[in-house]
Amino acid sequence: MDKTALQLRPATVRDVPAIDRLITHYAQLGIMLFRSHADLYESLRELTIAEEAGQVVGICALEIVWADLAEVRSLAVDPGAHGRGIGRRLVEAVVVEARRLEVQRLL
């Protein structure tokens, strides 16, 4: 396996500093809301990570809202990795997860 190729995987506790860095970057631009580390740890199981060469280059969360409804949240891609389809791949991954969970509607 090529260790520099983009990999999608579930988030781990080691990812929280990188997740915080991405969210803080976009929160400072007024695009996302700031999140505390406590909130990030609480929602860690909802997050999918895009990793390349050992670096987190994107995040996306799937939050189950109700029995038939889920929401795509916290989609963020490192500015240096824009234009490469990373956000699209992250959304596709959470859509697959929503289907696996038999969620009928996705926002």
Question: Where is each model-derived feature located?
Answer:
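Short glycine-enriched loop/turn motifs at secondary-structure junctions
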Residues: 2-4, 41-42, 102
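Conserved N-terminal entry element of GNAT/NAT acetyltransferase domains
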Residues: 1-13
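Conserved GNAT acetyl-CoA-binding A-motif
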Residues: 97-107
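Acetyl-CoA-dependent GNAT
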Residues: 10-17, 21-73, 78, 91-92
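Conserved acetyl-CoA pyrophosphate-binding loop and the N-cap/start of the following alpha-helix
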Residues: 81, 85-93, 103
